[in-house]
Amino acid sequence: MNNKQQESNSTLKKQLNPMHVWAIAFGCVIGWGSFINPGKKFLSNSGVAGTAIAMVLGALVMIIIAFSYAYMVPKYPKAGGEFTFTKNCFGKNAAFLCGWFLVVAYLTNVPMNSTAIGLIVDGLDGPADILKFGFHYSIAGFDIYMGEMLLATAILVLMGYLNIIGVQKAAIVQTILSSLLVICVFTLFVAALVSSKAKGINMSPVWGFDKSAAMAANATMSDINIYAHKGTAGILSAILATFAIAPWAYVGFDAIPQAAEEFNFSFKKVSSIMIVAIVFGCFVYTSNNTVAAAALANWPERVMSGEWVVLVAATELLGIFGKVLVGTGVSCAVLSGIMGFYLASSRLMYSMSGEGYLPKWFGYVDKKYGTPKNAILFCIIISLSGPILGREALGWFVDMSAIGASIGYFFTAAATLATAKADGDGTKFLKVMAMIGLGFSVIFIILQLIPIPGLNGVHFGKESYIMLIVWIAIGLVFYSMQRKFFSGKE
């Protein structure tokens, strides 16, 4: 395996510095969910304490897994990341499995982020409904308006265009967006610390509550503790409900290997960049969730009524400035998520095309800009489904993002163990980290796919199981069609 570290003959341009790469990873990690999910999932499922513990544990697991990525990237400094690692270590069939699920892990996040644009505008403009004009229809109970479709489509095309005209230009925009996002969240966090309106007593029930049962009983704040998660089983369920989606929450730090061919710096910096991106991501998730509960004495009622609790809390703390902070922060999160996953998805498809897993068309690199133009165009076209289908329908696919990411983590950890053994250069620490990462990858997959009694809100919903079967079926058809073009060992 000594030839693995040789320079690639890639036609992609080396234009990414460490700050660019951090911004890409962090921008992928933090999207719409960090601002929307405190009210939609985190506070009810896990509360402040359960979410904080789950996010910290999830970050620690991701850091453990990141050591495997840091070891493998210098070995295979090519676009494709986990797909490339798997192909070289375990052959073409395993590589197809890994690549196929990574595609859904990355690409579904682009249209899903685009559907948050309408929610952002709705939350900020109050009763004005500025985007609710023109024809409209509903899919799975989600209303879709022409105005929202037009804005989301324009943003998807613009972000895609920036990716096409040069990775450096896109990376500069990404760096600005990610930096501004951190500033907004940190400012809101400090405001909560110094404000008399944010109180620890407001955070109860700290482990969350049974939202469905409470809503069915028309519960109020006076009797919400009846439905609170209590006891060992309740607390464990609260933590695992959020911990199980850690692969989804942190998916994006692994976008770094996808752009490895475009780094203009030493690969020795990969581990530190990944760790910083994960830590910043953990801070944003935990901070937004904690601030939302601390600032609102009646947050359970607001959660049950479907309010955007992060926005309401920011407004309670800082008035109109708080509203501007959240609006700016979530906009940066959405745009950086779209930008980052465009890059990760297109580089993965570019790599798969080069190995015969996708048609050669996906591997075309623009001679002027040095970017995988056709792969990016494909990502744009697929992502335009977001404004058309709406959040609820896409949500069934997005649930698979965590599965796809977990499969990528599994193969990266396994490839690390195999490569370290073959090359004889892996430390005991690295091997232990890889084994732990391998184990947690399996745990994440089990938690999401297999219903476990007593653990509510952890596994897939019915629609997501159906979408998983559909994606596997499409993969089998595609595999049978493309298999003869695969290159690599059996």
How does the language model describe each region?
Residues 119-126, 179-224, 290-296, 413-423, ...:
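Hydrophobic alpha-helical segments and their helix-loop junctions in multi-pass secondary transporters
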Residues 13, 37-142, 147, 277-282, ...:
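Extracellular loop-to-transmembrane helix junctions
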Residues 16-35, 152-158, 213-295, 322-342:
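Hydrophobic, membrane-embedded alpha-helices of multi-pass small-molecule transporters
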Residues 121, 147-210, 274-278, 401-412, ...:
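Membrane-interface loop-to-helix entry segments
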Residues 1-39, 43-49, 62-67, 78-79, ...:
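Membrane-interface "cap" regions at the ends of multi-pass membrane proteins
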Residues 84-86, 91, 123-133, 209-230, ...:
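TM-loop-TM module centered on a large, flexible mid-protein loop between adjacent transmembrane helices
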Residues 144-147, 173, 361-370, 409-466, ...:
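C-terminal membrane-solvent junction of multi-pass transporters and transport-like membrane proteins
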Residues 101-119, 245-263, 285, 320-360, ...:
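Membrane-helix boundary/coupling elements in multi-pass transport proteins
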